[in-house]
């Protein structure tokens, strides 16, 4: 995850980032081609739009993977699937944080009186804001799905443990009388009349 900061003035836009960011590199040729036709706000919109579009395939990939995990058989898959679901949930949290920051920037730009916008600029920023809201809602839905997968896994493990305990209880119930008989006749009593009986062996 890369971080980019922007300062937008009346006749300029400055970006700050620690490494080359492909979204910036992607729009530079367009700006150089048309020159002054793009206002700083238009350039800002282009950059944010590219970033949001870059989020879409990432979110879609995570969504598809969570759908696959939801269909898995926990008995065969084991805890590795749970760890993967939790890891994907963490990725969604980071994506949501990035989208939230961009939403705040766009919202402040729209409501600020110090930002002079044309009607077209305002329309562009409203569109990108709606896209950010939509992607945030998709992320929230997938985070809930990841949480449901975790809950289902916990429920599965609980049922599995209960079944094991039930099986052990049945086995203990079967062997308890046998243990009692073995313990009783393993004692060194001098007189045990039933042992002298001709059917005593079969009875015991």
Predicted regions and their residues:
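A short, charged helix-loop
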Residues: 21-43, 66-76
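Residue-level signature of the cytosolic catalytic core of signaling kinases
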Residues: 36, 117, 157, 195-197
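Short helix-loop junctions at transmembrane helix boundaries
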Residues: 187-195
């Amino acid at each position: 995850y890369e971080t980019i900061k922007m300062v937008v003035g009346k006749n300029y836009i400055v970006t700050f980032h620690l490494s080359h960011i492909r979204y910036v590199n992607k729009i530079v040729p367009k700006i150089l081609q048309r020159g002054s036709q793009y206002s700083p706000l238009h350039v800002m919109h282009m950059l944010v739009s590219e970033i949001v579009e870059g989020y879409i395939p990432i979110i879609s990939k995570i969504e598809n993977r969570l759908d696959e995990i939801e269909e898995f058989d926990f008995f065969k898959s084991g805890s590795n699937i749970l760890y993967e679901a939790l890891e994907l949930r963490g990725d969604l949290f980071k994506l949501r944080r990035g989208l939230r920051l961009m939403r705040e920037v766009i919202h402040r730009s729209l409501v600020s009186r110090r930002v002079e916008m044309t009607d077209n600029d305002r329309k562009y920023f409203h569109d990108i804001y709606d896209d950010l809201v939509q992607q945030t809602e998709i992320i929230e839905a997938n985070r809930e799905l990841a949480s449901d997968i975790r809950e289902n896994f916990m429920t599965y493990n609980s049922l599995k443990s209960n079944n094991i305990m039930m099986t052990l209880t049945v086995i203990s119930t079967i062997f308890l009388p046998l243990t009692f008989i073995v313990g009783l006749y393993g004692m060194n009593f001098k007189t045990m009349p039933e042992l002298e009986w001709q059917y005593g062996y079969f009875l015991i």
